[in-house]
């Protein structure tokens, strides 16, 4: 294969939602050769994109990240308009529980203050009001929270299909089932070696999620992350009532786990009345993404069904279906994501952009634009300083 056919302006490694969004945002500028390399087939559910839905929310405790969700919203509307498919479904975002507990999702009281500061409307609710309105039972009397009506659910498969479609329409080359073995940056560009061939590119964007450290560690660095295989528990409803929102229960951790649970109502784009629940337990971390089994451990499932039995009388707590989702979370929860160039990690790293880890699906179109901006322009207008890749001088670990 000649050099002219193996050289690209931009190579994106990882063909999930952020990678495909990056390819779309870069290719739509025109005049650039863009390649996406995906180790599995496109639209697979082996990593962090499994399942049908993700939580859409405006609110964040951290105001710099909150500002980014407000920037992301019109980009979602553009994505919907370009593909003719509704992707954000505003069923509401209900947070309730211990208002002071700090979690990887945020803190209720701090988030309410952030909504006040940014003029985002919400309705404050007591435990009894939440029970009367939405049918929960047995909530501790001191639980409180809020309903933010603009939140809800994202159609995962619809979103991945949308950015896949747009990246192709704008001329990006998409190659599935091609595993990347090495990314070697230098001051003039980047060499990318796969199991099949070697490429040369001016810039590279890493959006390969749980497999990112396989490439970063070759630079003598490492991203401090935890990999968790989290259960997805589908339940049937004894009585289906419209109007229930997405919910997240903020609770004090136990000796066993973080004690955090969430639930989706029936998906508006589905014909099923089933609901999906899950825990957010950062326990039993995996050593490697390939250690994921695709089948949840019994104890976390039991914790979910026990919570449903205690507080959700409209559901049948016997699981109708079980699956898992692979979550890659920063070891330092304050950073939330890894997003920025790798200039501090390796010689020539300014030619590599990294976007991995965290609960980032809600940022799909914005993260794609930021990655394209950083790769093609060397800068972005958005405040992403919190997420920068700055290694420890002693260990090389990016915490």
Residue map of PLM features:
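Short hydrophobic core segments
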Residues: 11-13, 199-211, 368
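Beta1/beta-strand and adjacent pyrophosphate-binding region of the FAD-binding site
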Residues: 4-16
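C-terminal catalytic lobe of FAD-dependent flavoproteins
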Residues: 309-399
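Flavin (FAD/FMN) cofactor-binding and adjacent substrate-gating region
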Residues: 100-170, 175-176, 182-188
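Dinucleotide-binding Rossmann-like beta1-alpha1 core, especially the glycine-rich loop
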Residues: 53-133, 260-261
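Glycine-rich FAD pyrophosphate-binding loop
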Residues: 27-48
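Active-site substrate-recognition segment that forms the wall
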Residues: 24-28, 84-90, 208-350
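N-terminal Rossmann-fold NAD(P) dinucleotide-binding loop
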Residues: 19-20
């Amino acid at each position: 294969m000649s050099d002219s056919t193996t050289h690209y302006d931009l190579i994106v490694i990882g063909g999930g939602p952020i990678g495909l969004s990056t390819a779309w945002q870069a290719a739509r500028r025109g005049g650039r050769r863009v390649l996406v390399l995906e180790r599995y087939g496109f639209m697979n559910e082996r990593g962090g994109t499994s399942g049908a839905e993700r939580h859409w929310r405006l609110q964040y405790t951290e105001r710099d990240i909150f500002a980014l969700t407000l920037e992301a919203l019109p980009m979602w509307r553009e994505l919907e308009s370009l593909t003719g498919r509704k992707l954000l479904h505003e069923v509401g975002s209900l947070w309730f529980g211990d208002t002071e507990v700090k979690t990887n999702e945020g803190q209720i009281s701090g988030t309410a203050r952030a909504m006040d500061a940014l003029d985002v409307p919400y309705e404050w609710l007591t435990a009894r009001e939440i029970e009367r309105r939405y049918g929960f039972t047995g909530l501790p009397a001191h639980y409180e929270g809020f309903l933010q009506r603009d939140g809800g659910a994202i159609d995962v498969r619809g979103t991945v299909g949308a950015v896949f479609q747009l990246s192709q329409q704008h001329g990006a080359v998409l190659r599935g089932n091609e595993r990347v073995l090495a990314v070697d940056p230098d001051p003039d560009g980047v060499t990318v070696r796969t199991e099949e061939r070697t490429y040369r590119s001016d810039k590279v964007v890493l959006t390969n999620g749980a497999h990112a450290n396989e490439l970063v560690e070759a630079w003598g660095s490492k991203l401090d992350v935890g990999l968790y295989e989290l259960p997805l528990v589908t339940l049937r409803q004894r009585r289906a009532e419209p109007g229930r929102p997405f919910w997240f229960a903020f609770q004090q951790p136990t000796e066993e786990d973080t004690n955090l649970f969430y639930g989706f109502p029936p998906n508006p784009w589905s014909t099923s009345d089933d609901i999906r629940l899950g825990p957010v337990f950062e326990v039993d971390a995996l050593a490697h993404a390939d250690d994921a089994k695709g089948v949840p451990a019994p104890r976390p499932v039991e914790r979910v069904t026990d919570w449903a039995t205690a507080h959700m009388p409209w559901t049948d707590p016997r699981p109708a279906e079980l699956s898992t989702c692979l979550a890659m979370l920063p070891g330092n929860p304050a950073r939330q994501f890894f997003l920025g160039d790798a200039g501090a990690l390796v010689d020539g790293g300014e030619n590599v952009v990294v976007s991995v880890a965290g609960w980032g699906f809600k940022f799909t179109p914005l993260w794609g634009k930021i990655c394209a901006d950083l790769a093609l322009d060397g800068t972005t207008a958005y405040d992403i300083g919190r997420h920068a890749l700055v290694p420890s001088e002693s260990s090389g670990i990016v915490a």
